[in-house]
Amino acid sequence: ASLCILAALLPLQSHAESSADQWQWRATVYLWLPSLGGETSFPPSGGGPSIDVSADQILDSLNFAFMGALEGRKGPWGMATDVIYLDLGSSKKATRDFGIGRIELPASVDADLRLDITGWVWTLTGSYEALSTETFSMDVLAGARMLDLQQDLRWNLNGDISALPLPGRSGSSQVEDTLWDAIVGLKGRATFGAERNWYVPYYLDVGAGDSDLTWQGIVGLGYSFSSVDVTGVWRYLDYDLGSHTPIQSINFNGPALGVTFRF
């Protein structure tokens, strides 16, 4: 398992002068199938060194996702909002894909791990059409992105753990954080084909605030019907929070398929 989304990826085509002062809207629903990576340190409830895990080594399933976007445009001005809810979780048996502080893991020790991650990504932006030709458009945008994330880890250590300064063989820990970041970026599309129904949408933003750095990139291929667009893209969203927080980094990376309704 941001903002502006697939809807924000699809800038509205130029309008006739008679409709230039009217709001034009796009609503998008889409399926995003991201893989997830990042580093998190879970402090044991009974004290001792943290349990360190890499999400990409544990997670392999998306339990539930809701994703949608809304974009409005009036003349060269636009606004967009994008919301994503992710629920990911997975278990791994007899794994050594974890760390315990800076302590070397004994050769006989492995663990059964269960990692669950739930969260919201909400992006809100305003935009201005900086460039528009028959085949290419580009908007500049600014806004904010919110990430609300909760991670739960349960573990059971196997083998001889006498050398490890932990209060017990089993445990659980939870870390959560809510981040707000200001973002700036570009979005647009390049059209091609005899009737210019095919297009390549693109989106890029970068920002900071509660996180040290966040950025998002999207690129893909779309087709416009009379009142509906169908788009397939690759989307990458990354957060770097620094080593001073339990959630040190997290990223979402994968394909998305969206359907946009224009009205």
Describe each PLM feature range.
Residues 169-205:
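Detector for outer-membrane/organellar transmembrane beta-barrel domains
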Residues 21-23, 62-66, 118-122, 136, ...:
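Residues that define the transmembrane beta-barrel architecture of outer-membrane proteins
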Residues 35-63, 85-120, 147-179, 209, ...:
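Extracellular/periplasm-exposed beta-strand and loop segments of Gram-negative cell-envelope proteins
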Residues 27-29, 68-74, 124-128, 142-144, ...:
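Residues on the lipid-exposed face of transmembrane beta-strands in outer-membrane beta-barrel proteins
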Residues 217-263:
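Predominantly the C-terminal beta-signal and adjacent terminal strand-loop region
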Residues 31-35, 55, 74-76, 83-89, ...:
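Transmembrane beta-strands of outer-membrane beta-barrel pores
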Residues 15-86, 193:
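Short glycine/proline- and aromatic-enriched beta-strand/turn motifs that initiate or cap beta-hairpins
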Residues 15-23, 131-137, 192-198, 226-227:
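Short loop/turn motifs that connect adjacent beta-strands in outer-membrane beta-barrel proteins
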